[in-house]
């Protein structure tokens, strides 16, 4: 059973290294490191981990001479590890000086992120911005003009507030702040293009920390330009709050066809892997039917009929196993990301959901006969029982992948046939 994702806004297509963004390209998942970039080994390792998790573009902080001096080394380390993720340099305050003093850094990055709110004020700020754009032109790099609510150009914001105060019926302050974000992004994009940067190499973002503000800003930004757009709720927070807030904001915009790349800005729990933000971004796109990254595991939430936790443990085990296999499977079994596996806990919905999946198992609920029928492509093929249900079901999933997505497999042929040349 499949669903069709939403359409896409028509926009220009940018190129970040080998990754296309915007136009007809898939929505790109990206992430950001939290290591000290001056520590090249640690930063390269975290970039590699994020890339292995599925991040297609990774941003690193470039905030000091020590950091800028190590960017080229980070790129070389990644190349040696076989990591192809393009690197984005996140510049604030001193980006012009760092790009000038460290040309190897300028060359090694695939995209520069420039925040107009902290480049500088007046003529000096204009000169710094112009230098960074000229560097992007010289080295053929894309530029994200990333405006942020927390570092908005206050001169612009104050001017718009003053103009609003003179209106017969002033607009709410939040509406003016939203407009200031949009104007800042569009005006600076126009400056960059005026300096000679191709409009195809411009990506815009307007980051805020509240869901309704983000939706309103991006709807208007999308209406007023044809640049590729980077979506993300800044400072989304920790845990379930951060996941829910990001999902709520991004899903609305993506459903309207707005957004060409996304980043989920989660604050990791102490000791938690940075890769969680990548998984959440992928799952937003996959659950909306926009992209597929990992075989989907359908599992029931459990109820009074499922007093055993075995079905939950099996669902978790299968989901973890499939995700672990994807770095290898992605190359060996084209199309396997479309696989749907069902792990159900009782007879109420178990057989029905299992039949709709590619491979499904209906485990026994409370009071049911302790056997688990397995369905493959809608047909019951075997009934499992005993202590090795988990191992046997995993082996069935493995065999299905090899048969259907391996060399000569029917689903592999179908996937290759529909992929553009």
Swiss-Prot record:
One of its GO terms (molecular function) is 4-hydroxy-3-methylbut-2-en-1-yl diphosphate synthase activity (ferredoxin). GO terms for biological process: isopentenyl diphosphate biosynthetic process, methylerythritol 4-phosphate pathway; terpenoid biosynthetic process. The keyword Secreted does not apply. Transmembrane segments: none annotated. Keywords: 4Fe-4S, Iron, Iron-sulfur, Isoprene biosynthesis, Metal-binding, Oxidoreductase. Pathway: Isoprenoid biosynthesis; isopentenyl diphosphate biosynthesis via DXP pathway; isopentenyl diphosphate from 1-deoxy-D-xylulose 5-phosphate: step 5/6. SUPFAM superfamilies: Nitrite and sulphite reductase 4Fe-4S domain-like. The keyword Iron-sulfur applies. [4Fe-4S] cluster binds at residues 300, 303, 346, 353. Its cofactor is [4Fe-4S] cluster. Binds 1 [4Fe-4S] cluster. Belongs to the IspG family. Converts 2C-methyl-D-erythritol 2,4-cyclodiphosphate (ME-2,4cPP) into 1-hydroxy-2-methyl-2-(E)-butenyl 4-diphosphate. HAMAP family: IspG. This is 4-hydroxy-3-methylbut-2-en-1-yl diphosphate synthase (flavodoxin). It comes from Laribacter hongkongensis (strain HLHK9).
């Amino acid at each position: 059973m499949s669903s069709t994702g939403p359409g896409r806004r028509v926009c220009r297509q940018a190129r970040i290294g080998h990754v296309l963004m915007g136009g007809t390209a898939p929505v790109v998942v990206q992430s950001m490191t939290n290591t000290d970039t001056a520590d090249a080994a640690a930063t390269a390792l975290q970039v590699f981990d994020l890339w292995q998790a599925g991040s297609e573009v990774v941003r690193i902080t470039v905030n000091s001479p020590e950091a800028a001096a190590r960017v080229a080394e980070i790129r070389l380390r990644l190349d040696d590890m076989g990591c192809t993720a393009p690197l984005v340099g996140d510049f604030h305050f001193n980006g012009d000086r760092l790009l000038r003093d460290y040309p190897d850094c300028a060359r090694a990055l695939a995209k520069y992120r420039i925040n107009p709110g902290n480049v500088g004020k007046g003529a000096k700020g204009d000169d710094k911005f112009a230098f960074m754009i000229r560097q992007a032109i010289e080295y053929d790099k894309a530029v994200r003009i990333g405006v942020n609510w927390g570092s908005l150009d206050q001169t612009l914001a104050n001017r718009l507030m003053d103009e609003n105060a003179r209106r017969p019926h002033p607009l709410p302050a939040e509406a003016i702040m939203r407009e200031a974000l949009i104007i800042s992004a569009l005006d600076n994009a126009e400056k960059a293009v005026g300096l000679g940067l191709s409009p195809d190499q411009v990506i815009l973002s307007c980051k805020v920390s509240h869901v309704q503000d983000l939706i309103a800003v991006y709807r208007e930004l999308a209406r007023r330009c044809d640049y590729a757009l980077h979506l993300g709720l800044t400072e989304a927070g920790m845990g379930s709050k951060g996941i829910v807030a990001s999902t709520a904001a991004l899903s609305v915009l993506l459903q309207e066809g707005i957004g060409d790349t996304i980043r989920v800005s989660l604050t990791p729990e102490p000791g938690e892997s940075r890769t969680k933000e990548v998984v959440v971004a992928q799952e937003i796109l996959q659950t909306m039917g926009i992209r597929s990254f990992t075989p989907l595991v359908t599992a029931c939430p459990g109820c009074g009929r499922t007093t055993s936790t075995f079905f939950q443990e099996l669902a978790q085990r299968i989901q973890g196993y499939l995700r672990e296999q994807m770095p290898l499977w992605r190359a060996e079994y084209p199309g396997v990301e479309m696989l749907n596996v069902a792990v159900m806990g009782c007879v109420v919905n178990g057989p029905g959901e299992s039949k709709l999946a590619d491979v499904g198992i209906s485990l026994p609920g409370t009071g049911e006969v302790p056997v688990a029928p397995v369905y493959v492509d809608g047909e019951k093929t075997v009934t499992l029982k005993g202590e090795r249900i988990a191992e046997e079901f995993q082996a069935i999933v493995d065999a299905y992948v090899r048969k259907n997505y391996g060399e000569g497999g029917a689903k592999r042929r179908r996937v290759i046939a529909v992929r553009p040349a």
